[in-house]
C-alpha cells in the first residue's frame, strides 16, 4: 500500500510540476519533438536528481551512522574489510555506515564509484558470522565497482521518458478521437485530459517498473559473481543461505532495496528487484 501511495503521489507531482513549467516557459508539446524533449527533461532529470542526492537521502532515511573512528573491534574489522575489497575492486574507499534495524540487510548507494556509501544493518552485522558478513560486503562493493547505481539511473531515465511521452501521445489520440465524434469538437476538456494522462502514466509506469526490475535482477547476479571473486564463492553462498533462513526484508525503502543484499519477496517475480535467493544460490553453485 505504501509503495502504491508513493507511485500515485509521484505521478501527481510530475503532472503538477510539468503543467506549471509548461505554463511558465511556454513549452509547446503539441509536436512530437517538443513532447519528446519535455519527456526527456523530466524523465532523466528526476532520475539524476535522485542519484545525486542518493547518499544524503540514504543517511537521512535509514538513520545511517557513518564510521569515521571505529569504537570497537567489530567496527574496525568492518572498515578494514571494505577497504581491502575496495582496493581489490579498484575503486575509492566508500563511506561505511551502520544503521539500526533487526533485519539482516545491507545496501550500497552513491552517485559514482568514487563517491559511494556501503551500509549494513545491526541485525546483519551481529546476526551473521564474519564470513557471511564478508560475502555481503563484497556484494555491495561489487555493486559500486560495476557502476550499478549509474546504470540503473540511465535505465530509469529511459523508461521515465517513455512513460511521460507515451502517456501523452495516447491521451492526444484519445482526445482527437473524442473531438472528431463531438459535434462541438471540444474534445476531452482539460480535467478529463489530465485524468486520462494520469491513468496512462500509472499503466505505463507498471510496465516500466517491470523493465527496471528485470535489469535490476541481472545486476544482482553480476554483484553475486563479483562477491564470489572478492570474498570467495563459499562466503557468498553462506550469506545467501543465511538470508534464506531469515524473515522477509521489509523495512528498507525501494530506492535503497534495489542495491541491497536481500530484496522484497513477491508473488509476481516480474516485479522483484532481486532474483529469489534459491536461484542466486544455484547460479553461484554452477559457476
UniProtKB/Swiss-Prot annotation:
It is a multi-pass membrane protein. One of its GO terms (molecular function) is metalloendopeptidase activity. Zn(2+) binds at residues 139, 143, 220. It is found in: Cell inner membrane. GO terms for biological process: proteolysis. It is an enzyme of class 3 (hydrolase). Its cofactor is Zn(2+). Disulfide bonds: none annotated. The chain crosses the membrane at residues 4-24, 33-53, 154-174, 195-215. Its EC number is 3.4.24.-. The keyword Zinc applies. The active site is at 140. This is Protease HtpX.
Amino acid at each position: 500500500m505504501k509503495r502504491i501511495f508513493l507511485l500515485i503521489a509521484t505521478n501527481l507531482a510530475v503532472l503538477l510540476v510539468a503543467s506549471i513549467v509548461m505554463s511558465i516557459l511556454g513549452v509547446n508539446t503539441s509536436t512530437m519533438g517538443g513532447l519528446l524533449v519535455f519527456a526527456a527533461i523530466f524523465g532523466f532529470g528526476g532520475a539524476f536528481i535522485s542519484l545525486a542526492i542518493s547518499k544524503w537521502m540514504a543517511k537521512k532515511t535509514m538513520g545511517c551512522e557513518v564510521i569515521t573512528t571505529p569504537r570497537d573491534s567489530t567496527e574496525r574489522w568492518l572498515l578494514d574489510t571494505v577497504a581491502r575489497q575496495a582496493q581489490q575492486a579498484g575503486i575509492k574507499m566508500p563511506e561505511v555506515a551502520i544503521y539500526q534495524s533487526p533485519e539482516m540487510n545491507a545496501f550500497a548507494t552513491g552517485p559514482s564509484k568514487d563517491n559511494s556509501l556501503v551500509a549494513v544493518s545491526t541485525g546483519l552485522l551481529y546476526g551473521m558470522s564474519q564470513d557471511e558478513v564478508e560475502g555481503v560486503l563484497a556484494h555491495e562493493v561489487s555493486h559500486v565497482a560495476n557502476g550499478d547505481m549509474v546504470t540503473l539511473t540511465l535505465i530509469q531515465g529511459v523508461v521515465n521518458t517513455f512513460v511521460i511521452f507515451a502517456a501523452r501521445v495516447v491521451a492526444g489520440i484519445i482526445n482527437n478521437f473524442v473531438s472528431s465524434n463531438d459535434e462541438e469538437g471540444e474534445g476531452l476538456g482539460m480535467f478529463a485530459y489530465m485524468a486520462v494522462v494520469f491513468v496512462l502514466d500509472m499503466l505505463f509506469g507498471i510496465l516500466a517498473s517491470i523493465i527496471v526490475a528485470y535489469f535490476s535482477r541481472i545486476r544482482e547476479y553480476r554483484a553475486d559473481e563479483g562477491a564470489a571473486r572478492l570474498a570467495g564463492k563459499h562466503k557468498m553462498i553462506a550469506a545467501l543461505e543465511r538470508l534464506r533462513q531469515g524473515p522477509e526484508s521489509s523495512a528498507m525503502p525501494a530506492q535503497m532495496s534495489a542495491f541491497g543484499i536481500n530484496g522484497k519477496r513477491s508473488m509476481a517475480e516480474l516485479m522483484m528487484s532481486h532474483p529469489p535467493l534459491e536461484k542466486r544460490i544455484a547460479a553461484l553453485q554452477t559457476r
